[in-house]
Regions:
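Short, Lys/Arg-enriched, disordered terminal segments
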Residues: 1-3, 33
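Asp-based phosphoryl-transfer active-site loop
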Residues: 3-18, 91
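Small/polar loops that bind or transfer phosphate-bearing groups
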Residues: 16, 40-41, 177
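Active-site phosphate-binding/coordination module
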Residues: 22-139
Length: 189
């Protein structure tokens, strides 16, 4: 007997339009009505996951931040596994000389270190790299006017140096970096 259904969000629960299809929502409700527990398992932080689900009536458990935070059906934190600030600093110090975007993810916000202009450029690159289909208009004005761009901006705290992250005493659950320079990324790993 099935007791739990866990679903990823991007490309699984959410379609290309970043919405839950009506037939998927119906299936989730039918499973829950049959006594099967439903949960979201995603690399997103909790706030980012909730942003995508706000127009649904899904009540579920959450495994977010690639497993670093677990929340119950009432959205209360059940457990966390944050990275130590020392490890975050070591990662940052080892990567800061490379031309990559480094994102420190917490339960509520993503923290990016740099100037406002640098970070806004990184938003643009992120969307063009990961979120735009090859058939979509990927020019700067199309990206800047997209709802996805607005969500990324709203879910990001821009800080000028690592010390600000340390002083914020936020729990970092995941460090994410990206670049379209695959050769350089290979050197880092």
């Amino acid at each position: 007997m099935i007791k739990v259904i866990a679903s990823d969000m991007d490309g699984t629960l959410l379609g290309n339009d970043h919405k839950v299809a009506p037939e998927t929502l119906k299936a989730i409700h039918e499973a829950c009505d049959a006594g099967i527990r439903f949960m979201i398992a995603t690399g997103r932080n909790f706030k980012g996951a909730m942003e995508e689900l706000k127009e649904t009536d899904i009540v579920c458990d959450y495994i977010v931040g690639s497993g670093a935070e677990v929340r119950d059906q009432k959205q209360q934190i059940v457990s966390t596994a944050p990275l130590s600030m020392e490890l975050c600093e070591e990662i940052y110090e080892n990567l800061k000389e490379f031309p990559v975007s480094i994102i420190f993810s917490s339960g509520d916000y993503d923290y990016r270190i740099g100037t406002k202009k640098e970070i806004e450029e990184s938003f643009l690159k992120q969307i063009q790299l990961f979120h735009m289909d090859t058939g979509q208009d990927t020019d700067e004005s199309a990206v800047l006017s997209s709802p996805l761009y607005r969500r990324i901006v709203e879910n990001t705290k821009i800080i000028s140096e690592f010390q600000e992250l340390e002083e914020s005493q936020v729990s970092v659950y995941k460090v994410f970096l990206y670049s379209n320079d695959l050769e350089m990324l290979e050197k880092i790993s």
